[in-house]
Amino acid sequence: MSKPNVLDIRLATFEDSIVDLVINGLRKQPKTLPALLFYANEGLKHWNHHSHQPEFYPRHQEVQILKKKAQEMAASIPMNSVVVDLGSASLDKVIHLLEALEVQKKNISYYALDVSASQLESTLAAIPTQNFRHVRFAGLHGTFDDGLHWLKEAPEARDVPHTVLLFGLTIGNFSRPNAAAFLSNIGQHAFQGKSGDQCSILMSLDSCKVPTQVLRAYTCEGVVPFALQSLTYANGLFSEKNKTQASGDVQHKVFNLDEWYYLSEWNFVLGRHEASLIPRSKDIKLLPPLDGILVSKDEKVRFGCSYKYDQEERMELFAAAGVKNEVTWSDEGCDVAFYQLKLS
């Protein structure tokens, strides 16, 4: 099998939009940093290292379930489907599903989507394509929205069954209202056309609300470099946009990494883990083009949340999104489960 192609499906160059998101996020209250800032090449490497630690139960439970249930999941995917993986940073989970599809001799087109072209090429290069005859591989370079637009409009995809993969607790990164809106948006884009009744979402959710277990998972090795790498990436983006900056001189960079800590907290009221960056010891006056912005000593700059869903919250999510759960896959001792969703 030939080397998988990577399709550039970007509707806009999001590197520039990330800079704007950083500026806007730091000018509002409470201050935030955009998730896109954290998943550049080096950031993904740190995240993969972090997620492979023994304490990071979500990944280990996902792999455990997929190893046992992949054949059942694969059986639910129609022949001649397009499978789009929204968040394909690592193959160690989805490979079990792909191998099950191959065993079942299903002719499937698998598309890995990523905002990083180089990460996408690396991911696809790791696929043992020589072991697959029925499953075909390609990459989509773009954002979630780009991927959904492509599913709806691309001639090679729009009229065949679609399965959208949301592994890695991706939907938990959205606020509860935004999670419902995103699932609804998938339905509007991916579940239309001639094969709409055969389309589905396969996604994972975490129900664990034990603070000690959650906090151990999100503070284990690798997470601090992952968090701080975002500031290095931001410095590079600002340097590109403002050519007058001397990128090799720390004093001209927007962010000084030595001034920041990673903060991990469990929010009992909202049922979510919260990840933030916080000044180490003093107020931080940001440098141009963020001059005029002050981050106070005890002020949190939040960059990520991971919402946990009990049964009632799952039902509320599915109802608000206009989808119904067809099948649930989990395993003994697991807080994580996979759900197959279709339009209700």
UniProtKB/Swiss-Prot annotation:
Induction: Strongly expressed in planta but not expressed in axenic culture. InterPro entries: EgtD_Methyltrsf_superfamily, MeTrfase_dom, MeTrfase_EgtD-like, SAM-dependent_MTases_sf, SAM_MeTrfase_EasF-type_put. GO terms for biological process: indole alkaloid biosynthetic process; methylation. The keyword S-adenosyl-L-methionine applies. Signal peptide: none annotated. It holds the Pfam family Methyltransf_33. It is an enzyme of class 2 (transferase). Its EC number is 2.1.1.261. Keywords: Alkaloid metabolism, Methyltransferase, S-adenosyl-L-methionine, Transferase. Pathway: Alkaloid biosynthesis; ergot alkaloid biosynthesis. The keyword Signal does not apply. One of its GO terms (molecular function) is methyltransferase activity. It catalyses: 4-(3-methylbut-2-enyl)-L-tryptophan + S-adenosyl-L-methionine = 4-(3-methylbut-2-enyl)-L-abrine + S-adenosyl-L-homocysteine + H(+). Belongs to the methyltransferase superfamily. Homodimer. 4-dimethylallyltryptophan N-methyltransferase; part of the gene cluster that mediates the biosynthesis of fungal ergot alkaloid ergovaline, the predominant ergopeptine product in E.festucae var. lolii. DmaW catalyzes the first step of ergot alkaloid biosynthesis by condensing dimethylallyl diphosphate (DMAP) and tryptophan to form 4-dimethylallyl-L-tryptophan. The second step is catalyzed by the methyltransferase easF that methylates 4-dimethylallyl-L-tryptophan in the presence of S-adenosyl-L-methionine, resulting in the formation of 4-dimethylallyl-L-abrine. This is 4-dimethylallyltryptophan N-methyltransferase easF. It comes from Epichloe festucae var. lolii.
